[in-house]
Curated annotation (Swiss-Prot):
It comes from Saccharomyces cerevisiae (strain ATCC 204508 / S288c). Keywords: Membrane, Transmembrane, Transmembrane helix. The chain crosses the membrane at residues 7-24. One of its GO terms (molecular function) is structural constituent of cell wall. Coiled coil: none annotated. The gene is PAU3. This is Seripauperin-3. The lineage of its organism: Eukaryota, Fungi, Dikarya, Ascomycota, Saccharomycotina.
């Protein structure tokens, strides 16, 4: 015979698991919340691989980056407010413009969006 307390504990555990699951939201890839997650991953990647980015920039001197990204890389505080307002097409251009986008950045961005319960949909 199962004790009522065991059933109650099981129900409580299931309820806690449901409550802990992040809410999901589907957004346009150009939504500023998506851009901020992408830029956060990008800034973290630059910090972790700074020499590689310097070499890439030296080899591609015409590639320009928004000044806000450079400020965020070297400001180790909360940089998300610095990155608001960068146009979505500029975010896409700088992030996808590096050779390691598909091998390193895209998986990290997908993971970060998923962790935040954000999924993207291409607008019709």
């Amino acid at each position: 015979m199962v004790k009522l307390t065991s059933i109650a504990a099981g129900v409580a555990a299931i309820a806690a698991g449901i409550a802990a699951a992040p809410a999901t939201t589907t957004l346009s890839p150009s939504d500023e919340r998506v851009n901020l997650v992408e830029l956060g991953v990008y800034v973290s990647d630059i910090r972790a691989h700074l020499a590689q980015y310097y070499l890439f920039q030296a080899a591609h001197p015409t590639e320009t980056y928004p000044v806000e990204i450079a400020e965020a890389v070297f400001n180790y505080g909360d940089f998300t407010t610095m990155l608001t307002g960068i146009p979505a097409e500029q975010v896409t251009r700088v992030i996808t413009g590096v050779p390691w986008y598909s091998t390193r950045l895209r998986p990290a961005i997908s993971s970060a969006l998923s962790k935040d319960g954000i999924y993207t949909a291409i607008p019709k």
